[in-house]
Amino acid sequence: LWGENAPGLFTKMGEGVVDRLKAIGEKYGYSFSLIKTNTELHGIPQRRMRTFYFFWNTPTVPMLSWKFREKKNLIDYLNEIPEDATHQDMFMVEGKVTDHFKPYEYVLEKEGLTHSEFAAKFKKGTIAQYLEKNELIPDCIKWLEKHYPKRGFSNKKSTKTFIDMLEHQQYKTSQGLGYWDASPHFFHDSFSALIGRNMFNGVHPIENRYLNVREMLHLMGLPLDFGIENPKQVNHIAQNVPVTTAMDMADEVKKFCRGEAKMTNYTFLKQDNTNHKIIDSTEIGTEPKKKYKVKSII
C-alpha cells in the first residue's frame, strides 16, 4: 500500500502522523518508509515538493533508488506543445495580462519593455513584489489615478480598484505584515507548484497572457491528447501527482513486487531524494529513538 501526501508529512510537523502510520503498519505486519522528492527531479519544470509513503508487507523496507531525470527550462518545455493540441483556447483568466492587471501596463511603460523582454529581465516574482522592491507603488498609484481610476479585476461596482489594492499593500507592509498577492506571477526556469492562485496568475514567459489549460496539463506530465470535458473541472488538474513523479515511485513498487528491490535491515526508513540523504531509520530489533513531547502554548 502506498500513497502521496504534502511535504509537511516529511517534516517535524508530520511526526505525529508518521508515528501513527508506523503503529498501524506494525499491527498488521508491515514495515513503513517515506521519501521526499521534487517534480523538478522527475523531468518536469515544476517545483512541487511532495512526500510518498509506503507500507511494505515484509519485516524490513527496501532502499528506494535515487531519482533524477533531466528537465528542460520552462520555455522549452512549453514549446513542446504542438499547435494542434486541444485546450489551448481554454483559460482560467482570459485576455492579455496588461488588460487584466493594469499596474502591469504601468510597469511595461515605465521599463520601456515588451512583455517577453520584461519576463526575461525580471525572471521570477510577482508584479506586486516588483513594485514594492523598486519603490514604485506611489508612482503607480498616480498613474492609475490618471489613466484607470475605476479599474479593478472586475467591472462590478463592489470590486476594489487597483488603487485600493496598492494602498492596502502599502498599509500592510508599513505595519510589517503580509498581504494577499493576486498580481501576475512570473516564472523562469521552473514553474511553482501548480495549485491554487498559481493557476490563475501564472504568466506565460513569452506571450502577454496567462497559462492556458493545455500548458497546465503539460506541466502535470499528462499526455498531449489528454482532455477535460468542462472548464469547471480545471482545478482537478492540481489535485493529482505529476505523471513522471508518480511513475518513478511506481517503478520502485514494481521492483519490490518482482523481488528485485534492494532490501535493508530497517523497519522504518526516511529518504530525501532532493539531497540523497537518509534522514531517519530504525533497524530491525532496535527500539526507535525517544521523542520528547512539548506542550502547546496555544
Predicted regions mapped to residue ranges:
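Class I S-adenosyl-L-methionine
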Residues: 2-174
